[in-house]
UniProtKB/Swiss-Prot annotation:
It is found in: Nucleus; Cytoplasm. Residues 33-45 have a biased composition (Low complexity). Residues 54-155 are annotated as: Interaction with HHV-8 ORF57 protein and with ICP27 from HHV-1. InterPro entries: ALYREF_mRNA_export, FoP_C, Nucleotide-bd_a/b_plait_sf, RBD_domain_sf, RRM_dom. The RRM domain and the N-terminal region (15-58) seem to be involved in RNA binding. GO terms for cellular component: cytoplasm; spliceosomal complex. SMART domains: FoP_duplication, RRM. This is Aly/REF export factor 2. Residues 174-190 have a biased composition (Gly residues). GO terms for molecular function: RNA binding; single-stranded DNA binding. Keywords: Chaperone, Cytoplasm, Methylation, mRNA processing, mRNA splicing, mRNA transport, Nucleus, RNA-binding, Spliceosome, Transport. Residues 75-152 form the RRM domain. Residues 16-37 are annotated as: Sufficient for RNA-binding, interaction with NXF1-NXT1.
Amino acid sequence: MADKMDMSLDDIIKLNRNQRRVNRGGGPRRNRPAIARGGRNRPAPYSRPKPLPDKWQHDLFDSGCGGGEGVETGAKLLVSNLDFGVSDADIQELFAEFGTLKKAAVDYDRSGRSLGTADVHFERRADALKAMKQYKGVPLDGRPMDIQLVASQIDPQRRPAQSGNRGGMTRSRGSGGFGGRGSQGRGRGTGRNSKQQQLSAEELDAQLDAYNARMDTS
C-alpha cells in the first residue's frame, strides 16, 4: 500500500472510510478530485482536550511588573462551501495533521441536515494559519473550500497594580474576558461580522512569521 504522505487528500479519506465500512457492505462512493499535497507526518488521532480552569489561581511570586500581553489560547477557522456529504470525521481527518484540535465539526440544522459549513478550533494559532494557507480554495468533493480565520481567543494576563497604602505591589484581576469577538450574533454568508476579512497569502505568511518569532524569543 502506498505511503499516505504520497496520497491525495481525498484518497486518504476514501481509504479510511472504506476501512470503517467493512461490516456495512459496499455502497456507492463519492468521486473526489485529487488534491496535491506535500508529504506530512500525520499526528495522533483527534482527541478531546482537557478543560481549562475557569478561575485564576494565585502564584507565589510574580517577578513581572508589566503583563500587557495576552496569553494565546487558540484560533478558530470557519470552513464554508462544503459539499453536504462531508462529515465530522472528514473535517477532523483533514485538519488534525496541522496540530491539536479542540473541536472540528460540521454545522447542522435542527433536522440534522448539513449547512455546508464547519467550525475548526485549534489549540495554537500558528497551526490554524498553516491549515488555512494549505486548504483555502482547495476543492473537496468538487467544491473549493472557503476558509476564514475567526477572531483570536485571547486570555489577558492579570496586571500587578500599585497599592496606595502599601509600599509593595499587589496583583489585581484583569477585567477583560475573551477579546476580539464582535457584539453581533452568529450569522452566515454576508451577515458575519465585517471585521472578519479574508487574509491574503502574504498576510498569512506575515502573521505566521511574527508568531514563530515571538515563540522563539519567549
